[in-house]
Amino acid sequence: MCAQDAFQTQRSQLVELLVSGSLEGFESILDRLLSREVLSWEDYEGLSLVGQPISHLARRLLDTIWNKGTWGCEQLTAAVREAQADSQPPELPSSWDPHSPHPARDLQSHRPAIVRRLYGHVEGVLDLTQQRGFISQYETDEIRRPIFTSSQRARRLLDLATVKANGLAAFLLQCIQELPVPLALPFEDAACKKYVSKLRTVISAQSRFLSTYDGAENLCLEEVYTENVLEIQMEVGMAGPSQQSPTTLGLEELFSTRDHFNKEADTVLVVGEAGSGKSTLLQQLHLLWASGRAFQEFLFVFPFSCRQLQCLVKPLSMRTLLFEHCCWPDLGPQDVFQVLLDHPERILLTFDGFDEFRFRFTDQERHCCPTAPTSVQSLLFNLLQGNLLKNARKVLTSRPSAVSASLRKHVRTELSLKGFSEEGIELYLRKRHREPGVADRLLCLLRATSALHGLCHLPVFSWMVSKCHEELLLQGRGSPKTTTDMYLLILRHFLLHASPLPLATHGLGPSLIQGRLPTLLHLGRLALWGLGTCCYVFSAKQLQAAHVDSEDLSLGFLVLAKRVVPGSTAPLEFLHITFQCFFAAFYLALSADTPPSSLRHLFQDHRPESSPLARVLPKLFLRGSRCREGSVAALLQGAEPHNLQITGAFLAGLLSQEHRSLLAECQASETALLRRWDCVRRCLTRSLREHFRSIPPALPGEAKSMHALPGFLWLIRSLYEMQEERLAREAVCRLNVGHLKLTFCGVGPAECAALAFVLRHLRRPVALQLDHNSVGDIGVEQLLPCLGVCKALYLRDNNISDRGICKLVEHALRCEQLQKLALFNNKLTDGCAHSMARLLACKQNFLALRLGNNHITAAGAEVLAQGLRTNNSLQFLGFWGNQVGDEGAQALAAALGDHQSLRWLSLVGNNIGSVGAQALALMLEKNMALEELCLEENHVQDEGVCFLAKGLARNSSLKVLKLSNNHISSLGAEALLRALEKNDTILEVWLRGNTFSPEEIEKLSHQDTRLLL
């Protein structure tokens, strides 16, 4: 009773201790009490209710323990003391039996140690338990609710194991045995703890506000952050016809993927075009870590900006890099550094903007000493290779064009940041505009102007639309179509806000620009100098040299650089790299110092630095070009190709007829503008013709094919920015190809608009292949103007839904030339079936429809079959990787029985059994045109094969029958052999991956060589 009396007198202090920490700490106390059988399972359930205030739960716990007597009170006191001391739970005993006859009891008695071991692995274990059928999707989603930490998710999984009687507890015992033993935290000394705390504080302060795109206001990142589409990048050439679309990840799954280019590497590469949200993604990662909400497997996070790193000219060591250029330890720096060296697996380093690092990656110079000074590029390259801090995880962001093959050798996983989905655009605008009706009006505007909607898939454009929403909604101006239109709109917005009120009524007229022309030219000269010298952050001295003063800075286009070491002077940078390119283009368009002849460097595809020798000897090539140092030509020659492409597109837009008249009133000589326009026009036309001349001749019997590269796409975008039909017509008048291939080229909606603007002037029909891009529904809409010159359109793996395809089909019905559509690996469902059926019924010259790897079921197949009944032209129908089942197979077979033109039918992986096989067999008896039937990866089995054998015996057209992976035994094979005796037409029957023994395979192979086993 004495212990109980003491317990009662300390009740208020115990309540305070229990509620002073987090819910995580409270639950760890429950773990200890449950494992020691102080609490029964019923007690625990009443104390672990989600959503209850922790103070309420604490008082209920004290009441429960009081009723258990002295021993219970002593155990609770001990558990609270252990939690206060942050002592680690004991590890699982060496006598641990993963095959225990009482698995649920063992999970409970060792619960604290099991929670600790599951920490860091709970997501993988959850996936495994769901795959094995132990828990449902609903239960998985409940456990993965965002409010739960990893430890809390582990506890919820253990709770399920206690109440489920389906073998989950036994399965978890075995899983836990295989998990690695967690490292005991070696970071108990005060210096290390204080450093971790300081790191979190510094990174939280740097990450909390999103000011990269706006110098006028600070946006709270948590309030506006919107997930981008993040996909695992496939290797070019590795995607087979049946491969599924790339996996889409959430940010918190950044390190969870098992798709590795190089399992020995430590670097995760995130690629994305300028404005796709790479920097913001890293900023959100940093904030999640600093606030303790994610990525807690890392105890140390070190963020770096490549554009700032390249400014470091003095040799430095890794220790200097981490401490002096990120965060300095206030206590025991040597002890802290030793901990970092001893435990690199607890470290995450992020490097943002590798495309802005002027040094080209090389793995020739090896540097392994963490305390020896070396150049900043050597330090970075050896960190990425793992020569320094091996096993520390690194995240590197870059534009795709800056990533070389030699760098990719050291990449563990490559992820592609695609920008916003349509849902993401809406979510972002609603977060930015919470006033009633504003977001709705903006979204209506976007949906009514597909060109602007297409631009908004890049977050930088969504920000611009949000920033300029008043101009877009209230002033009645024509909606922007091109990138240049959008940047001129944001320029107008900033100028109006910096101008006296009377000027605000004049719009973006000559007076508004002319009044700030000196400022714009100062910024333009600084931007161009920065591009030419690969400088993207500017010191006060550099600003002074460019004559940029405080009045120029007041416009807001230059903002303080992020990730600056505390206590140092922050340099300035443009809002975004695209703004730097825009101002450089503005300077090139209006400055009297710009010779028109120098503009050719913007549009040359074969620049000297593109050759291997030029990369080795860049200074030699620059001298050989005889450009005066600091001249426009010299700066353009020194700029990175991807920045030249953006600048060239902006210049083309500024010199377009629409915008040239605006700029002419700010320029003393209109003749100078016309000269520059003429130079850009000639350069674009010449560069395109060089592309066309480089096309190899067609192979005998094949159409002439052009595999375009991203550089070609930028030339097309520049033509689109100029918005001149005559120039587009002249540019492609000599393009004589039958097949234009633009796969893996980063084609999004904006690029689709540019392609359609130019390609619609082709004189001959072309097969346009846009596989493995980011076209989406909006991009499909942008392509419609050029559909009339397409004889085939390939849109594999482009995130297209029913809405986009229905619009495409509606337009295709009026396009006589279009004969082939390839739409596999998208998001199509039964909702598009009526449109597809109408296409087949109405276009009697249509030859090929490929719909593989979508989400079409029997209902969709039945609708499509209606169109097939009246079609007399289709030769290829691809349905692999859907879910048509037996009913869908029956509907298709009934429609194809009398079809006179179909030669190839694929129903691979459609869950077709013997019933569907019987229907297809009846179709084979009637159809005398089909030459290849693909039924791999179904459930045909012997019964279905016997039906097919009967149909085969009466068929005289089929040449190839594919039945691999269908659970067929020798019984089914014997039926096929009997049918083959009566059929001389069939050339191949595929039976690989079925249930034959080695002896049966050898025997069957000798009986008929047409059986491929």
Curated annotation (Swiss-Prot):
Q: Where in the cell is it found?
A: Cell membrane; Basolateral cell membrane; Cytoplasm; Mitochondrion
Modifications made to the protein after synthesis: Palmitoylated by ZDHHC5; palmitoylation is required for proper recruitment to the bacterial entry site and hence for proper signaling upon cognate peptidoglycan detection. Palmitoylation promotes localization to the cell membrane. Palmitoylation protects from SQSTM1/p62-dependent autophagic degradation.
Question: How does this protein sit in the membrane?
Answer: Lipid-anchor
Query: Acetylation: is it a keyword of this entry?
Result: no
Q: Which UniProt keywords apply?
A: Adaptive immunity, ATP-binding, Autophagy, Cell membrane, Cytoplasm, Glycoprotein, Immunity, Innate immunity, Leucine-rich repeat, Lipoprotein, Membrane, Mitochondrion, Nucleotide-binding, Palmitate, Repeat, Ubl conjugation
Report the domain remarks. Answer: The ATG16L1-binding motif mediates interaction with ATG16L1. Intramolecular interactions between the N-terminal moiety and the leucine-rich repeats (LRR) may be important for autoinhibition in the absence of activating signal.
Which residues are listed under lipidation as S-palmitoyl cysteine? C368
Annotated region described as Required for CARD9 binding, given as residue ranges = 214-247
Q: How does it assemble?
A: Homooligomer: homooligomerizes following muramyl dipeptide (MDP)-binding, promoting RIPK2 recruitment. Interacts (via CARD domain) with RIPK2 (via CARD domain). Following RIPK2 recruitment, RIPK2 homooligomerizes via its CARD domain and forms long filaments named RIPosomes. Interacts (via CARD domain) with ubiquitin; inhibiting interaction with RIPK2. Component of a signaling complex consisting of ARHGEF2, NOD2 and RIPK2. Interacts with ANKRD17 (via N-terminus). Interacts with HSPA1A; the interaction enhances NOD2 stability.
Q: Which GO terms describe its molecular function?
A: actin binding; ADP binding; ATP binding; CARD domain binding; Hsp70 protein binding; Hsp90 protein binding; muramyl dipeptide binding; pattern recognition receptor activity
Protein's UniProt keywords contain Lipoprotein: yes
Q: Which GO terms describe its cellular component?
A: basolateral plasma membrane; cell surface; cytoplasm; cytoskeleton; cytosol; extrinsic component of plasma membrane; Golgi apparatus; mitochondrion
Can you name this protein?
Nucleotide-binding oligomerization domain-containing protein 2
Q: Name one GO biological process term.
A: regulation of apoptotic process
Provide the binding site for ADP.
T212, Y225, T226, G275, S276, G277, K278, S279, T280, H576
Q: Name the job this protein performs.
A: Pattern recognition receptor (PRR) that detects bacterial peptidoglycan fragments and other danger signals and plays an important role in gastrointestinal immunity. Specifically activated by muramyl dipeptide (MDP), a fragment of bacterial peptidoglycan found in every bacterial peptidoglycan type. NOD2 specifically recognizes and binds 6-O-phospho-MDP, the phosphorylated form of MDP, which is generated by NAGK. 6-O-phospho-MDP-binding triggers oligomerization that facilitates the binding and subsequent activation of the proximal adapter receptor-interacting RIPK2.
Q: What is its main location?
A: membrane
Q: Where are the LRR-type repeats located? A: 764-785, 789-809, 817-838, 845-866, 873-893, 901-922, 929-949, 957-978, 985-1008
Q: Where is this region: Disordered?
A: 82-106
